[in-house]
A protein has these predicted regions:
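Multi-pass alpha-helical transmembrane bundle typical of ion/small-solute transporters
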Residues: 1-174
Length: 174
């Protein structure tokens, strides 16, 4: 649950910024996974058990987001809460990318899937951003992990959109 500000002032809202940022990161992650899977499964013709199992693991990881988000919001300057929040997002990113690779492997002759090229290296950029956040949190700026998670999720969305537009316009590899 998001707490309500104690008064109708910007200052009261600002006190709760960690809650709102963490909630926003969680929402963007859920939306992006749903939207990406929606687009991916529109063109997939065959899936195997590996795809189903990896998506089941991904769903489990997603169910952990509210728990770790709440822990983070209770103490955004805790290395333990920052670390577990970041590790969850790393796990989600890795599992999602593994699931996409599994989809490609289970449907290797699907021309639409090959053209869409969901299995690309650009998907690893958000993971690198989160890892940079770990470096920040453990060296100079404790909230670095959750800020890097926000940046990574936004990058994930932007990269996917640019990539999709590039494929639609014939600018990416086909």
């Amino acid at each position: 649950n998001l707490p309500q500000p104690e008064s109708a002032t910007i200052g009261a809202f600002w006190v709760l910024k960690t809650y709102y940022i963490a909630y926003f990161i969680s929402f963007l992650t859920l939306f992006n996974i749903w939207y990406s899977n929606h687009n991916l499964f529109q063109i997939v013709e065959n899936i195997d058990n590996t795809v189903v199992i990896l998506n089941g693991i991904l769903i489990f990881e997603i169910t952990l987001i509210p728990y770790f988000t709440l822990w983070l919001t209770q103490d955004a300057y805790s290395i333990a809460s920052e670390t577990t929040f970041g590790l969850l997002f790393i796990a989600i990113n890795i599992t999602y990318n593994m699931a996409v690779k599994a989809v490609h492997k289970s449907d290797p002759y699907n021309d639409k899937l090959i053209k869409a090229d969901y299995d690309n290296l650009y998907a690893l950029i958000p993971l690198a951003v989160i890892l940079i956040g770990f470096g920040l949190s453990y060296s100079v700026f404790i909230p670095g992990i959750y800020i890097s998670c926000l940046i990574a999720v936004i990058m994930w969305i932007v990269i996917a959109r640019i990539h999709r537009k590039g494929v639609e316009n014939g600018k990416w590899k086909i």
